[in-house]
């Protein structure tokens, strides 16, 4: 049975926007389905379709702001597939904001292990040909503290398999009284109405069909999203030529697997004569006994004729084709997957009652680790924005900003995942890698190995593209330009760099203060006004912005940092208005009047009618 949740409804502008879903028209689904059991979620409760990591992070974000959610998840258990194995620094910053980062590190790969990536011609050789020596989280954190110039994230990255992460995150969700997780319910479709959404769901065991009404729905239901299909949103892009076999297994035969050294990823190129490209990779999931092999196959190869053990041995043998056997204690799972690069043309329904996030709106190849991490940022973004609207301290433009801000980021992730994959895939043919010559102990062999080393050290952005992860700029109606912006030019985008900048739409730079505290730890749950009171007249500006926020019932934390000259220099403005997600809404050195302060706060919170557009104004009129 469906549980009925209750929530206190704020007396706010949301009473004009989020009408009881029970008021929505009933006859949405076909005639024969009109008599199906129906549940109307209480006003302010968000329905999330898909209980994987993106759906759970979305629910966790909503819960942080006191907003209830119901998750419909078709699977009865969490994933057994390793999938994601890198949590990048931007995701860790999000988890820190949600209060779960430290607990996640406790279940992840211990933080002293480096992220070494080896490139090998095969384990028959004594040594790998080259390596990307990427730092451990401990080393990364040390570098962040030492550098302290605003160009680094506030949190180092993390190694954790999705198999572990999803189970851990689901347990947190099940313990949260504001999250109602319902397993075994497959959503068949959704209808977006003027004042809500109707969703049809079927139980996987009983076949029972229910209709659920909610004010808002977020589709986190993967690449084959029923929610996206219900909205008839097309995908641009699709599968890439070829496929891969995944073998996830247990083995303590470390002396053979790690013959060429400890690694996080171990890559094997194909010989140029064997079609070039990458033969596959091994991922060390826990530095104990859990490994994942990805073996890329030509479309004409039938993998079912090979055992899982044969696939592993063949990959470890490298480009020479001679298998390298190891002791496999247990094969956990095996599957095939096809690389896909695709982007949804829209992230929301036309009435902005339905939104999609994660793989439902973007699919990337694994290179760079952008897929899951981009989805996590999607869920966090729509989570805080929807919570703010439901609670009345943000207006309609806030919901419009989700697609405007997040879709370009999805496009950026797709672009660079293809660049990284392309660099790996074309290496063998470009260098003319030869399985016999590459291991020769002579000048020819040394030259070929040297060429491969040089190529890979030049094309090493695979996991070092911090600009792609957090150096982008949001451009939307809730980013407020000011007088200071006329004097400045935005930093040039570079995939390998994050240039600190507090122009509207950029992530607020991380800096340690003189107390040793990261400035981001002082941010409130709502908006934060960071003030560097070094000059005269700043108190008046601060009070005007505080008063403007009070009039809009906008939660605003004012953080005054006198004497923090270094942080002030990095941030480049005396006043910076920071959103709940750590991105900048507005910056300036002063506010000239209360009227200007009111305008800044109104636009930043999505209430400024001049920046809504005719579509949203029409929606508001219909809601009235």
Swiss-Prot record:
It comes from the Eukaryota. Induction: Expression is positively regulated by the aspyridones cluster specific transcription regulator apdR. Keywords: FAD, Flavoprotein, Monooxygenase, Oxidoreductase. InterPro entries: FAD-bd, FAD/NAD-bd_sf, RIFMO-like. FAD binds at residues 73, 359. The keyword RNA-binding does not apply. One of its GO terms (biological process) is biosynthetic process. Gene3D superfamilies: 3.40.30.120, D-Amino Acid Oxidase, subunit A, domain 2 (3.30.9.10), FAD/NAD(P)-binding domain (3.50.50.60). Its cofactor is FAD. Pathway: Secondary metabolite biosynthesis. GO terms for molecular function: FAD binding; oxidoreductase activity; oxidoreductase activity, acting on paired donors, with incorporation or reduction of molecular oxygen, NAD(P)H as one donor, and incorporation of one atom of oxygen. It holds the Pfam family Rng_hyd_C. It is an enzyme of class 1 (oxidoreductase). Its EC number is 1.-.-.-. FAD-dependent monooxygenase; part of the gene cluster that mediates the biosynthesis of aspyridones. The polyketide-amino acid backbone preaspyridone A is first assembled by the PKS-NRPS hybrid apdA. The assembly of preaspyridone A is initiated by loading of malonyl-CoA onto apdA, followed by decarboxylation to yield the acetyl starter unit. The growing polyketide chain then elongates into a tetraketide. The adpA PKS module catalyzes three Claisen condensations, as well as beta-keto processing and methylation. Belongs to the paxM FAD-dependent monooxygenase family. This is FAD-dependent monooxygenase apdD. The lineage of its organism: Eukaryota, Fungi, Dikarya, Ascomycota, Pezizomycotina.
């Amino acid at each position: 049975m469906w549980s009925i949740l209750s929530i206190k409804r704020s007396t706010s502008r949301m009473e004009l926007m989020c009408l009881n879903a029970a008021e929505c028209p009933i006859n949405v689904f076909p005639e024969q389905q009109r008599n199906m059991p129906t549940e109307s979620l209480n006003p302010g409760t968000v329905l999330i379709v898909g209980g994987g990591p993106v759906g759970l992070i979305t629910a966790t974000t909503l819960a942080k702001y006191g907003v209830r959610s119901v998750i419909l998840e078709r699977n009865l258990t969490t994933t057994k597939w390793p999938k994601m194995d890198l949590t990048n620094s931007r995701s860790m910053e999000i988890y820190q904001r949600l209060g779960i980062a430290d607990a996640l590190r406790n279940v992840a790969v211990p933080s002293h292990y480096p992220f070494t990536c080896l490139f090998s011609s095969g384990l028959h050789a004594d040594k790998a040909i080259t390596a990307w020596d990427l730092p451990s989280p401990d080393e990364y954190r040390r570098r962040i503290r030492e550098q302290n110039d605003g160009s680094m994230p506030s949190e180092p990255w993390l190694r954790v398999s999705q198999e572990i992460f999803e189970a851990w995150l689901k347990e947190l969700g099940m313990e949260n009284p504001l999250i109602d997780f319902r397993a075994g319910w497959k959503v068949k479709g959704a209808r977006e109405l003027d004042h809500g959404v109707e969703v049809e769901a079927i139980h996987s065991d009983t076949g029972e069909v229910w209709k659920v009404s909610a004010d808002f729905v977020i589709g986190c239901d993967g690449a084959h999203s029923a929610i996206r299909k219900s909205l008839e949103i097309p995908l641009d892009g699709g599968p890439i030529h070829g496929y891969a076999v995944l073998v996830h297994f247990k083995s303590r035969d470390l002396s053979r697997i790690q013959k060429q050294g400890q690694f996080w990823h171990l890559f094997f190129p194909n010989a140029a004569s064997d079609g070039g490209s990458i033969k596959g990779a091994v991922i060390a999931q826990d530095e104990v006994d859990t490994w994942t092999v990805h073996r890329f196959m030509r479309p004409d190869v039938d993998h079912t004729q090979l055992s899982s053990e044969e696939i592993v041995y063949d990959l470890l043998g490298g480009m020479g084709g001679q298998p390298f056997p190891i002791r496999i204690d247990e094969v956990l799972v095996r599957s095939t997957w096809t690389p896909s690069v695709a982007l949804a043309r829209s992230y929301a329904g036309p009435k902005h009652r339905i939104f999609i996030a994660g793989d439902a709106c973007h699919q990337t190849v694994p290179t760079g680790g952008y897929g899951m991490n981009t989805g996590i940022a999607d869920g966090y973004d729509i989570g805080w924005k929807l919570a703010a609207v439901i609670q009345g301290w943000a207006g309609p433009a806030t919901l419009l900003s989700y697609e405007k801000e997040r879709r370009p980021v999805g496009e950026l992730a797709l672009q660079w995942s293809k660049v990284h994959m392309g660099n790996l895939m074309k290496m063998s043919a470009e260098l003319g890698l030869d399985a016999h010559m590459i291991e020769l102990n002579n000048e020819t062999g040394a030259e070929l190995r040297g060429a491969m080393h040089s190529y890979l050290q030049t094309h090493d952005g695979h996991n070092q593209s911090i600009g792609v992860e957090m150096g982008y700029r949001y451009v939307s109606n809730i980013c407020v330009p000011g007088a200071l912006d006329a004097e400045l030019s935005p930093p040039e985008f570079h995939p390998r760099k994050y240039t600190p900048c507090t122009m509207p739409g950029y992530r607020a730079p991380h800096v340690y203060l003189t107390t040793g505290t990261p400035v981001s730890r002082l941010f409130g749950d709502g908006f934060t006004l960071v003030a560097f009171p070094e000059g005269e007249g700043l108190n008046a500006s601060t009070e005007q912005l505080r008063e403007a926020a009070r009039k809009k019932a906008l939660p605003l934390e004012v953080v005054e940092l006198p004497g923090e000259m270094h942080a002030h220099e990095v941030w480049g403005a005396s006043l910076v208005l920071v959103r709940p997600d750590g991105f900048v809404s507005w910056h300036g050195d002063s506010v000239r009047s209360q009227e200007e302060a009111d305008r800044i706060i109104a636009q930043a919170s999505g209430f400024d009618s001049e920046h809504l557009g005719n579509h949203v104004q029409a929606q508001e009129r219909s809601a009235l």
